[in-house]
Amino acid sequence: NGGYLFLQKVYHELGLDKICKKIEKKHKNEYDLNEILSMLLYTRVLYPGSKRSSLEDAKRFIEQPKANIHQVYRALSLFAEEMDDIQAAVYKNSLKLGKRNASVIYYDCTNYYFESEEECGLRQYGHSKESRPNPIVQMGLFTDKDGIPLAFCINPGNKAETTTLKPLEDKLREKFGISKVVVCTDGGLASYENRLNDHVGERAFITVQSLKKIEKHLQEWALKTTGWKLVNFQGKNGPELSEIEYDLTQLDSQKYADALFCRERWIKTRLSKTGEELEQRLIVTFSFKYRDYLRHTREKQIARANEIIDKGAAGKLGKSQNDPKRFIKQESCTEDGELAGIKTFSLNQEMIEQEERFDGFYGICTDLEDNAAEIIKLNGGRWIIEDCFR
């Protein structure tokens, strides 16, 4: 197989062969790191599989590797030890091949499960993205604005995701030379500590904000039906907002099905632990299409919840956004208020109505003063990093 020859060109352009030689001089090992790394990368693209199977598959290449599996495993330990410097060197070498747009970077975390019940090293029990009862290892990833990976970190599966952002940002500044940057994250990584960290110097943040978690007076403002501006992503000078303000209740949802509306304001938040105050912009968007999507999804979940109640299989009630059991409530008393020996389950109409209030609405927080339409567009680019994980 000579397909790896096309990959070989990119491998050398990124200077990975020279990086390996530098590591060899430092550690004085007796095997060829360049051969092992190139073999692992080529087979990862051509024949994805385990390290052992990669070594076997590489025997199909015109240039076959001489390393054995024990040397491959020892090399992996060296690569792990030098990983920060390897990533920084690859980034700097990539700048010679083309422009890297690192003015806006996206960060997200995922985790990988192991078919084992024992915790060991990085493999720890934590919150699994797939809700599997297995130990997991966590991975954090930065991509640039174009979706090209910048840097990653590997952490134990029981580590809080919010604590992984700052250390990797520090590496970007110290080793990559990236300091003037806008960091985009989802709501799960948007702790106020992380926002404050990106609210200094030449750094800024854009993050998803759950409208269910903001103060009541801000919720009332966010869900008002009047004072909305239409977002135009195709403006003459880039994304822009309309001068006209709209009342959502007066609009034809079919005519404006693909439209996006926006409203914004500045808010102040004080951290209870330190007393520090953060001033940020709350940008709220509304979409009829998004509203209808949430309603349709909920209708199916309610139907599923009714089936569970009818079968008497409610069991432990759920809280997850995707769990239909969150719409089921449990009662252990009679209509007269007396304690009952038998538990009864029914639909939680109050929970359903509470969720319906937020249908179609979406929140973003930022400390940037740029056009709100531009902020919305930048935040929309977060799908790129999710694509990388797939």
Regions found by a protein language model. Give the residues of each.
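Anion-binding and metal-coordination hotspots
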Residues: 1-3, 13-390
